[in-house]
Each structure stands twice: as structure tokens, then as C-alpha cells.
Amino acid sequence: MNIGIIGLGDMGCIYAKSFLKAGYRVYGCDLPHRRELLETELGPYGIEILKDGKEVSQISDVIFYSVEAERIAEVVSQYGPYTKKGAIVAGQTSVKHPEIEAFEKYLPKDSHIITCHSLHGPGFDPKGQKMIVIPHRTTKEAYQRMTDILSSLGSILNEIADYHEHDKIVADTQAVTHMGFESMGTAWKEAGFFPWENASYLGGIDNVKILITLRIFSYKAHIYGGLAILNPYAKQQIKRYAESESELFKLMIKEEADTFRKRLYNARDFIFGQNHKPLMLNEKVMQEFSLSAGSENRKPNSHLSLLSMVDAWYHLGINPYDNLICQTPPFRLRLGIAEYLFKNEDLLEESIETALFDKTIRGDDLEFHSAVREWSSIIGYGDMEGYKQHFEQVKTFFAGRLEHGRDQSAELIRKLEIE
């Protein structure tokens, strides 16, 4: 059985090594100028680097396209027509609309389209990680063959029958989640301080916010840009998040306490009042992973980013627990800290009182409000280049701590047993 991987970036390389380890012959390719480097890096493992996707497509029984979502149509149009007769073809992008459209347009009619989505980043081995499998155009026999191949990696497979449903869920679990953390990063950059040096960001919830923000900015902008801009369901959900944040912020400024409190308690009852198995994040563990070197006492925080998320879920009629089938560590952590906040009435009341009446945090909330509007506008306009530039500016601001933050967040994820 020959496995082919078109696109040997971070994820492509991880899967090439994993399939080889599982006993398959692996062929791969990338851009021409990277061939020599990849031969040096992957050749010793026994992975054969071919000239281009045409050669990979002609020799492989199962082909994975591991390229940016914004380039999937271009790449499939070049190499899809050369797909081996009866081969299985999959994509590794996180948004399936452009991928399926390209496969249907350029692949031979006898090819099987069984696409997938790995719910982890390049910092994790596929073993034990969740993977979504979507049988779009296939037979029972080919689907069994594909699931056997993917299971050999040790991944935990979950099937979603329809790619539209996948993209709806991922709009919440990834696009809106990432945009929330990106807005925090932008707000801290514009305010000109590192949050771990500020007493308002020393609690367990804030440790998680900081580490996941650093984790996201330690990766590549195109990963998140494609998720947000190319997913047709993401814009609606991101727009609702921005509206929730703006409406809550206006109530805070006007100190309309009764309306503000009632709105959040209604959202709490809708999301957390049902009989779900709680995620139960551990405060002791969250406190361990602080980047702060000092011993200042924690100041109350409005947690506007979390209030806005829960309010947006409520207005969209989304139950985030239903979306755990497509969970990623940042989404599960975000839902976990929202649950931790909203199911602790004393902490929720502290957050509400701080949001309404504590002027010392209002400047930070204003920066967050501006950042949410900026990110929402960029995504709404479909401005991929603007997205990347905005992302890189924040990445530069945090450059000295990104690697450490990613390592810490990976350890936090492992310790909270949410891989």
C-alpha cells in the first residue's frame, strides 16, 4: 500500500513519518525549492521525495493533500487529474467546502473522496489524538480500507457524514475560538504590556488565556486565516461574537447592571443549566502554569472575552458541548474556563461587578473591544493578506515568549488530560 502526501509542511511531515512507522510505503512532494532539504530530512526515514504531485498521484493508493486551504483548488487542479485509478483521496485542511469543491471538479470519477481533519497541531503525535473522517464519495469497502489505514496511526476516529456539518461545527470550535484569543493578543499588544506582568491577569483562568494565546501566535497565520475566511459558516458566528461583545461593552459603559446581569444569567442557564458532563478544569493545575515571576495579589478581571463567548453561543442557539466531537485543545480549554467561570456564582458575580464598576480594568476592555471589531472586519471583508499582517504584528510583539508559551500550553494540555 502506497501512501502519498502532497505538501510536506509541519503537518505533512508528521503524517509522513507516522504512516511510515505504521508500515506503509510513503511518497511525498512539496515546492521544488524544498526538495533537497526534504530529501535530507526525510530520506533517512525511508520516505521517498518525488518531483511533484503528478508523480505522487500516479503511484499512490491513498493520497493526502496537506496544503493551505487558500491554495487547495490550485494544487488539486494541477495534480488531481493524474490520480491513480481507484485511489482514495483526502485533504487535511480544517475547512472542507473549498476542498470538496476542488476534489469534485478535478479528480477522476473513479476516485474515492474520504477526507479527514486532524484535531491537533504539529506539536503532537497523531497517536491518541482525535481525527474527523468524512466519507463524501466512496464505497463501503474503500471506506473500511481508509479507516483501517487511519486507525493504524493510533488516532481516535470520529465520523461526520456531511462536510457541511463539519464546517458548521468547526466555525465554532476553531474559527471563533481562535479569533477570541487573537483579539486578546491584539489588545495586550495595543495596551503595550505583557499580561503576565499585570495583576489583573494572574488567576488560573487568565493563565489559560495567556498560554493559549501564545500557542496560537506561535503557529502560522495561514492556518487560522483559512479557517476564518474560507469557512462559509464562520463569518456569521464571528459576526455574532463581535455583536455580543459590543452589546455587553455598551451595557458596561452605561452601568446597566440589571440588564447586563439578566442577560448573562440567561446565557448561563441555556449553556450550563443542562445535564452535561462537566469538563471540571482544575484551579490548582491552572495556577501552576503562570508566566508571572512576581507574587502580586490577583486583581478581579471582567473576563469580557468569556462573557461574550457564552452570550454569542446563547444568541446563536449553539450548545458547545455538542461540538466536542470536533474539539481541539484551545476550544476545550476555552469551554472549560467559561464553564469554570459561569458555574462558580461567586466568581461570575465578581466578573460582572468588575465589568460594570471597576474603572481600572475598563481601558483593557476597551482595547479588547477595538481588537474584536478589527478582527471581525478583516474576516468579514475576506481580507487574507490583512489577516496575515495583523497576525504577524502581534506575533512580533510576543516573539520572545512564544516558544516557551507553546511548551507550557502543551504541558498544561497534557496535565489536564485533554489531548
Each model region followed by its residue ranges:
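Short, well-ordered alpha-helix to beta-strand connector turns
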Residues: G23, G46, S60, G86, ...
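Rossmann-fold dinucleotide-binding core
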Residues: K96, F103-A171
